[in-house]
Amino acid sequence: TGAVPKELPLTGVGDGIHVLHTMGDFFDIEAQLVQHQPKRAAIIGAGYVGIEMAEALTHRDVAVSLFQRGSEVLSTIDADLATPINDALTQTGVNVFTNATVTEIAQTPSGYRLIGGATDETFDFVLVVVGVRPNSTLLEEAGAEVTTNHAVIVNDRMQTNLPDIYAAGDLVQTKH
């Protein structure tokens, strides 16, 4: 249970394309960075993890381009808060592309090219961090009620509709 990385409906995803969700993913990425020392990185997803990784990679002297499907970075917060973050990223050298829906990752002799990413630049390293989705299969099979996006429905005490079964975190439907 918990959550798993969302998968984008991209063609061309394979070796050399990374996600960051687990410690194992982190160690794989770290090994890739040490072994290959990429100079240009593309990060698809400008949420918290994407922004943190953009900062971490720029500290390693990697040129970073950050691609966001929506009109602002951190789409979960108000635009008046996201704009200064966008500006700070730009000031540190991150190329921020908003309203950029990447539809394909093409491997070329000179690196990876993002189709729909608003640039023809190629990259040595690609990271896809577009959020998570509930990993509710076990609870669904047990009969738990879920939403259309498979988040487990709970009450104010975090109880599911199943006797003595509680759920919390990325797995459950949130109420804002």
Pin down the residues of each PLM region.
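Short beta-strand/turn micro-motifs composed of small residues
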Residues: T1, G45, Q68, G169
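Glycine-rich dinucleotide-binding loop and its adjacent helix/turn
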Residues: G2-R60, T148, V154-D156
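Glycine/Thr-rich phosphate-binding loops of Rossmann-like dinucleotide-binding domains
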Residues: K6-L8, I51-E52, L74, S136-T137, ...
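Acidic/polar active-site rim loop that often engages polyanionic ligands
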Residues: E7-D15, L66, G70, H176
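FAD-site-proximal beta/loop scaffold in flavoenzymes
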Residues: D15-V34, R113, E121-H176
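Conserved SAM/SAH-binding loop
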Residues: M23, N99-T103, A118
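Rossmann-like dinucleotide-binding cores of NAD(P)H-dependent redox enzymes
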Residues: R40-A42, Y48-E104
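Conserved beta-strand-loop-beta-strand element in the redox core of flavoprotein oxidoreductases
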Residues: A106-D120
